[in-house]
Swiss-Prot record:
Residues modified as Arginine amide: R11
GO cellular component, one term: extracellular region
Transmembrane domains' residue ranges: none
Signal peptide residue numbers: none
Subcellular location: Secreted
This protein's UniProt keywords: Amidation, Neuropeptide, Secreted
Organism (species): Rhodnius prolixus
The protein's name: Tachykinin-related peptide 6
Summary of the function given for this chain in its UniProt record: Myoactive peptide. Increases the amplitude and frequency of spontaneous contractions and tonus of hindgut muscle.
Keyword Secreted: yes
GO terms for biological process, alphabetical: neuropeptide signaling pathway
Length: 11
């Protein structure tokens, strides 16, 4: 989901 994308983006 969108939250996952934000998580990977932070990494």
């Amino acid at each position: 989901g969108p939250s996952s994308s934000a998580f990977f983006g932070m990494r």
